[in-house]
A protein has these predicted regions:
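An anion-binding catalytic pocket shared by soluble metabolic enzymes
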Residues: 58-61, 65-73, 104, 108, ...
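Structural signal for hydrophobic packing residues in well-ordered secondary-structure cores
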Residues: 170-173, 177, 205-208, 286, ...
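Non-catalytic accessory segments adjacent to catalytic cores
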Residues: 75-189, 291
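Contiguous alpha-helical scaffold segments within structured protein domains
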Residues: 2-36, 59-68, 126, 133-160, ...
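Residue-level signal for inorganic ion chemistry
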Residues: 176, 233, 280
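Short coil/turn connectors at secondary-structure junctions
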Residues: 50-51, 86-89, 115-116, 177-178, ...
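ATP-grasp fold ATP-binding core
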Residues: 56, 178-185, 214-217
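A generic N-terminal leader/anchor concept
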Residues: 1-118
């Protein structure tokens, strides 16, 4: 019997015994067996009738979250914050660069750690009854994860455009219009076959170790995926954890050369200054909400093809500071 079948049976039994009440209720089922993240991605991939989909694998902790469906949606940080505080239920979602956000209370959330796989089924019993027959029919479905070959990567910016952008940025920095810029270039990938966002995340997981991996799919046609080594925001009580990740050098096939590059990065004035700019920016934006900062010594965050200079940052938050306050400042 698969782990999904076991979870389905537990949730179905609880649903059949549920007394008619009003308000939010969350049913929980647990299997004392861990599963691979690829199985969770395959399960998400097979859920064609329940959206949105959300997948999030933590970087430093053995915990992965996969969700489908939405019982309730929120389009502002304020709304999401109020709901979480009043209900103690977990939301998933994110914030765009422009500040637009979307968070949802998922219909079904699976949480995996090193020992257990736990399912959380959320209902609002004050609303019209929902038929879960179809939902449970797909609960046990999984789709195999495939590998893809890239046929034609194409940069969105030519070398001359790249050079012109840098020169323009320097002019604006000298004039005081900007204090810093982050160099970035978009790459358009063309694949030999039709692709699946879920398979791309699995491929990235295998290559980009030591990263957060995530997926957000509004529907079957559109998905946002990524893998990032950098922590933006983690909170535990009145403690906030973030980090400055800036300054980069290559990782080569030669371990000795890679280590030499790392030592150069730790002592290079330009990269140290670049990293400190990020530290200063974080401190400046959070200063009104923080009682004390602790900036750790620089260290190396090594990935499969590059290594970065990183400073871990811890802060003690003032009383009554909300998540939304911090996120608005550092996002």
């Amino acid at each position: 019997m698969s782990v999904f079948t076991q979870l389905e049976q537990q949730l179905s039994e609880q649903l059949s015994q549920l007394q008619s009440t009003q308000g939010w209720i969350q049913l929980t089922a647990e299997v004392n067996l861990s599963v691979e993240e690829s199985l969770l991605l395959g399960w998400l991939k097979s859920q064609n009738r329940h959206f949105p989909h959300f997948f999030f694998e933590k970087r430093d902790e053995n915990q992965t979250i996969a969700t489908i469906g939405a019982v309730k949606t929120f389009s502002s940080l304020e709304e999401a914050q109020v709901f979480v505080q009043s209900s103690s239920l977990s939301l998933v979602g994110g914030i765009q660069f422009e500040g637009i956000c979307q968070f949802v209370l998922p219909r079904l959330m699976l949480v995996k750690n090193s020992q257990n796989l736990t399912a959380y089924l959320t209902l609002n019993l004050s609303e019209q009854a929902v038929d879960f027959t179809e939902f449970f029919t797909e609960l046990n479905s999984t789709s195999p994860v495939k590998n893809y070959q890239i046929s034609a990567p194409q940069s969105s910016c030519t070398f001359e455009q790249w050079k012109a952008n840098i020169e323009q940025a320097i002019i604006q920095i000298k004039s005081g219009d900007l204090s810093k810029v982050v160099l970035a270039n978009a790459i358009q990938l063309t694949f030999e076959n039709l692709i699946s966002a879920y398979d791309l995340v699995e491929q990235s997981r295998a290559i980009n170790l030591g990263c957060y991996h995530f997926l957000w799919a509004e529907n079957a046609q559109n998905a946002f995926v990524g893998s990032t080594p950098e922590r933006l925001y983690y909170r535990k009580g009145n403690q906030l954890f973030t980090e400055a990740l800036a300054g980069t050098v290559a990782v080569s096939d030669n371990p000795i050369e890679t280590e030499q590059n790392a030592q150069w990065l730790l002592n290079d004035a330009k990269n140290i200054y670049e990293n400190l700019l990020v530290v200063e920016d974080i401190e400046e934006h959070l200063n009104a909400y923080v009682e004390a900062f602790e900036v750790h010594l620089p260290e190396i965050k090594r990935l499969h093809n590059v290594q970065h200079l990183r400073r871990r940052i811890e802060a003690i938050l003032k009383a009554d500071v909300l998540d939304q306050d911090c996120l608005r400042q550092i996002h």
